[in-house]
Curated annotation (Swiss-Prot):
It comes from Malus domestica. Keywords: Transferase. This is Alcohol acyl transferase 1 allele RGc. Its EC number is 2.3.1.-. Involved in the biosynthesis of volatile esters which confer ripe apple fruit flavor. Alcohol acyl transferase that can use a wide range of alcohols as substrate to produce esters. GO terms for biological process: alcohol metabolic process; fruit ripening, climacteric.
């Protein structure tokens, strides 16, 4: 395929999309999980679609999605409002129907020419999701920005940015599914959303009943190379975990342990160890890795409606000194991850809400020795069909400082998991070297395989 030299994206005037029908004018409180400091940011998501004339001949994706957005906002009308802050930093949404931001764009490039540049960390994100001045705040700003960019091949890219205080990944998926159903001609969403944020208010009186390492004040004893405030120092790359990498990692774990661990657990243990080595963290420093655990469903005993689209998760945290994490076999890190995840239940989530209220809605720990991982491989973004079939890729567009998202990705002929990482430039090369070392097949195994691949970094 012919590569493109300079991408030219033409944008039309920014619009405000309002609900298609009048909606309630009211004020709704966010939950005490929603409005914590650590969720007061915007999350970028990118979704890429091929042309599919057999399904949607002569249809304009911009027109279809614009109209579907407006109709879906009738049911998700709080997203068309604006946040305001009350006493004790309590967030609430003014459901005033002002609307979400929408922009139509076109680019002189095909999806094939873009290739891996649509994958996280998407180097063209600023072109496909332009940051309009003043649009990325938390209080008093639009809660959603959507840009639909039509490509010369007939395909298109839908990129969006959502205020994380309003919804998590499953909640956003409910909204996107509603838009997709409307785009395909439905009169109403198949799943009608519920607000009910009071279900995750703090208790009266609030009481902290669990240990929450994720919100502890931490003194950073590292060499200072990880300075998240200095974004010029940070670089992003994505790393692919396919069948070969997972096979090598599993061989390093005792049989009685591997039988009860998930792919997520194993990758998280691997990343935690390699990242700690790459950052050269002080051996006596406590290292933390938090796993975002969804509270929905029967597994964690949290009674929430399936139609709930607010934030319904916690990040239980594994803690270890850097020295044993680096020196012990991979199984040590794996056991830490499994034990941390096992602490998640309804009591844990209630205790988080109470802690946040009692301590003024604090930020989670933000030192370089801390990593947050979120499994989006089953979030369902790849099933969102606006009438052009399933997306070529759909998911978070990049890592966010300390946060890495696991996304499903097909590399050549196999399905695997892509993990974007954000690290200081000085540590990124060491991280890749450690990752290649820990996922390298022993020589005797390589001889037994016709083909061997290594960890792939995607710039």
């Amino acid at each position: 395929m012919m590569p493109f030299s300079v991408l030219q994206v033409k944008r039309l005037q920014l619009e405000l999309i309002t609900p298609a029908k009048p909606t309630l004018q009211e004020t709704k409180f966010l939950s005490d999980i929603d409005d914590q400091e650590g969720l007061r940011f915007q999350v970028p998501v990118i979704m890429c679609y091929k042309d599919n004339p057999s399904l949607n001949k002569n249809c304009n994706p911009v027109k279809v999605i614009r109209e579907a957005l407006s109709r879906a906002l009738v049911y998700y009308y709080p997203l068309a409002g604006r946040l305001k802050e009350g006493p004790n930093r309590k967030l609430m949404v003014d459901c005033n129907g002002e609307g979400i931001l929408f922009v139509e764009a076109s680019a002189d490039v095909t999806l094939e020419q873009l290739g891996d540049k649509i994958l996280p960390p998407c180097p063209l994100l600023e072109e496909f999701l332009f940051n309009f001045p003043g649009s990325d705040g938390i209080i008093g700003c639009p809660l959603l920005l959507v840009q639909v960019t039509c490509l010369t091949c007939g395909g298109f890219i839908l990129a969006l940015r959502v205020n994380h205080t309003m919804c998590d990944a499953p909640g956003l998926l409910l909204f996107l599914t509603a838009i997709a159903e409307m785009a395909r001609g439905a009169h109403a969403p198949s799943i009608l959303p519920v607000w009910e944020r009071e279900l995750l208010f703090s208790r009266d009186p609030p009481r902290i009943t669990c240990v929450h390492h994720e919100y502890e004040d931490v003194i950073d004893h590292s060499d200072g190379s990880y300075a998240s405030s200095n974004q010029s120092n940070m670089v992003q790359r994505s790393f692919y975990f396919g069948a070969k990498e997972m096979r090598v990692l599993r061989k390093q774990i005792p049989p009685h342990v591997i039988s009860t661990c998930s792919t997520f657990d194993l990758i998280t243990a691997c990343l935690s160890k390699c990242r700690t080595l790459a950052l050269k963290i002080n051996p006596k420093q406590a290292v933390r890795v938090s796993c975002v655990v969804n509270a929905r469903g029967k597994h964690h005993n949290v009674r929430l409606p399936l139609r709930y689209y607010g934030n319904a998760f916690a990040f239980p945290t594994a803690v270890s000194k850097a020295e044993p994490l680096c020196k012990n076999p991979l199984g040590y890190a794996l056991e830490l991850v499994k034990k941390a995840k096992a602490t998640m239940n309804e009591e844990y989530l209630r205790s988080v809400a109470d802690l946040l209220v009692l301590r003024g809605r604090p930020q989670y720990s933000s030192t370089g020795s801390y990593l947050i991982v979120s499994d989006n491989t089953r979030a369902g973004f790849g099933d969102v069909n606006f009438g052009w079939g399933q997306p070529v890729f759909a998911g978070p567009a990049k890592a966010l400082d300390l946060i890495s998202f696991y996304v499903q990705h097909k590399n050549n002929t196999e399905d695997g998991i892509l993990v974007p990482m954000c690290l200081p430039s000085s540590a990124m090369e060491r991280f890749q070297q450690e990752l290649e070392r820990i996922t390298q097949e022993p020589k005797e195994d390589i001889c037994n395989n016709l083909r061997s691949t290594r960890i792939m970094s995607m710039m």
